[in-house]
Amino acid sequence: MEIRLAEKHKLIEVLYVIRECSRQLLEKGIKYWNNSLADYNDISEDIANQFVYLLVIDRVTIGTVTIKPDKSNPKTLVISRLAIYPPYQKRGLAPQVLSFAEDLARKNGSTILKGTTPIEDKSLGQLLEENGFINQGSENEAPDEFISIKFEKRIV
C-alpha cells in the first residue's frame, strides 16, 4: 500500500470511500459521518491545504485519512476521517496509516497525535489503544448521538 497526498481531482474518490464507510457504520447503528455539503467543502479545503491522504493499492484508492495541525496547539496533529473501503478492512492497513501519521508528526516536530471515535465504535477505539493511543474520555459538547471518545498519543 502507498500513502500519498490527495489531489483536487481525487475529491470524489475520497467522498466515495467515506460514504461507503458511513453506510457500514450506519448498519452498525453508529451515526457519525453523513457526507453533507459541509463535508464536501471541508474535505475540498483540506485537500487544498495538503492535509488529506489517499491509501492506494495498484493505482486504486482504497482509503483516506486527514492529518492536520490542531488549531489550538501547533505541536499537535489531529487524525480524522480515517476510512478504508470495506472490502480492504481487516488487512492490517489501519495500523500502517497510524504509523504513517506518527512519522509525519515526527517530521513536523509535533509531540502529540490525537483523534476521536464515536462512542459506539468499540473496534476503532481498540485499534487506537493497540497502537499506543490513550483514551482521554468523552467529549461532552456534542449532541447525544455524536458523543465521541478522545484519544491521544505522545510522540517521542
Question: Over which residues does each language-model region extend?
Answer:
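Residues forming the Rossmann-fold NAD(P)(H) cofactor-binding site
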Residues: 95
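Acetyl-CoA-dependent GNAT
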Residues: 8-11, 16-87, 98-100, 104, ...
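Active-site acidic-Proline motif in GNAT/NAT acetyltransferases
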Residues: 85-87, 91, 120
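Conserved catalytic-core motifs of GNAT/GCN5-like acyltransferases
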Residues: 116-118, 125, 129-149
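Conserved GNAT acetyl-CoA-binding A-motif
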Residues: 98, 105-117
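Short glycine-rich hinge loops at helix-strand junctions in the catalytic core
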Residues: 92, 109, 132
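Short, surface-exposed alpha-helical segments at coil->helix boundaries
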Residues: 40, 122-125
